[in-house]
């Protein structure tokens, strides 16, 4: 019998629980606020986690933002219901908590601030005065946890309908449909729901007009083809000029983070595919890497290269759709049909390897579902010989077109400061001249072993620059795939680890303890050690991350999913004010988003 597993149980785990006291920022905080001003939490997140007092939040945030090498981006902000958490040794007493994840580009380091809250006092000052992109994150945290952010400019629901009762991510809120009463939609309730969707400008701080004229308010979406999904944006117009606008999201919200609390660590993998439904295996990568940190698993070299290969195939697939639909939004129809021919070749290859097309659910904790099939290298070779010429034809026929350039150059332009303020990542950030791609800056899954370049813009991110960067990213992904083809390691496709992989059959037939453990792992799911882990990756649309909290159970205590599209849609008003409606259509096409990635 061929052994397709490697025994890693006796090796030193790659991820140790660390407090990161050696990180320079801890010393800087202690020098400024005193050695006893906060509690440092040891985790497997890979970043310092610091509990601070609520009264210090704004002062600490301002201090970090003004350091010589500042923490310039609020990467994520959300909450947690701590009431049922049993493993909290050494942490401040808390019924709920709010965390703030900050990034320093200059240091290439992060810090996570946490604030403990009592159930009878769920108040914390708004962070919007320091980071404008805290707006949506605070609205979502209030919506799903009921935590109030004092001073927030418009604290209202964002994911759930305005008529919703309760806060779904609380532990006392039902997680299964069978725990609810049967759904009924009466005429009165339908009228109430429709009334709640009526846009009232005063609720958003907008005026209906000036002394001399009235503004027009236009609904774009939630079913407009240029909205790229179930997404509404309300425009305040002075003629064709956009005075202001309000993006309205949540129509595609499926409770993905709540589902993480009721699925085993293994059975949640198919849900990750559907967060950004064009990304396929790219979505699975941060989740399985975060779980592997919790378990202390190091995967074989072959697994790393296979994962990179599948991720880059899906990156090309997503970028082709993005580029062709952008061209279509500007007014040219033909390229989108050419792109679907190319994408079909990728799907044929993906299906041959994984058995599925869009949502493979193929990565596994500790490896992949099965080894590469015979002939995979021939299919990949054929695609690599085909694609470069096609890419050149897209660029020559459409992207160098004078009309397309005129419609997109200088439109929805912003610089590095604005990109960082709004949490922009991916091509939108790199177009401003900031060279930050997680595959290079913080390599994962063996990306450090590949030779490829990161395309960077000249200082201003506009619609055309963002698209052309993705064209170059396609070429770099082809370089990576060429190296995967020529340097695929031999060896197993999964780690022999008791938390993830069933044992060989002969072992279960000889050792009763092995059989019992196998039975429990399959029926209940693996029990991950109580800890916290975090993993970010360079996804197709920007940085995607999973922040997992284990309470020593078969299921995640808290699954936080940070997606790039959410931040990018929040930036729309700041980037498009003063432009025309036709410019907005081009801008929406240049963002590269799908609403499942926004709403989760």
From Swiss-Prot:
It comes from the Bacteria. Keywords: Cell inner membrane, Cell membrane, Membrane, Multifunctional enzyme, NAD, Quinone, Translocase, Transport, Ubiquinone. SUPFAM superfamilies: HydB/Nqo4-like (SSF56762), Nqo5-like (SSF143243). It is found in: Cell inner membrane. Disulfide bonds: none annotated. Pfam families: Complex1_30kDa, Complex1_49kDa. The keyword Calcium does not apply. Its main location: membrane. GO terms for molecular function: NAD binding; NADH dehydrogenase (ubiquinone) activity; NADH:ubiquinone reductase (non-electrogenic) activity; quinone binding. It catalyses: a quinone + NADH + 5 H(+)(in) = a quinol + NAD(+) + 4 H(+)(out). Residues 1-190 are annotated as: NADH dehydrogenase I subunit C. It is a peripheral membrane protein. GO terms for cellular component: NADH dehydrogenase complex; plasma membrane. Its EC number is 7.1.1.-. Residues 214-600 are annotated as: NADH dehydrogenase I subunit D. In the N-terminal section; belongs to the complex I 30 kDa subunit family. In the C-terminal section; belongs to the complex I 49 kDa subunit family. NDH-1 shuttles electrons from NADH, via FMN and iron-sulfur (Fe-S) centers, to quinones in the respiratory chain. The immediate electron acceptor for the enzyme in this species is believed to be ubiquinone. Couples the redox reaction to proton translocation (for every two electrons transferred, four hydrogen ions are translocated across the cytoplasmic membrane), and thus conserves the redox energy in a proton gradient. This is NADH-quinone oxidoreductase subunit C/D. It comes from Escherichia coli O157:H7. The gene is nuoC.
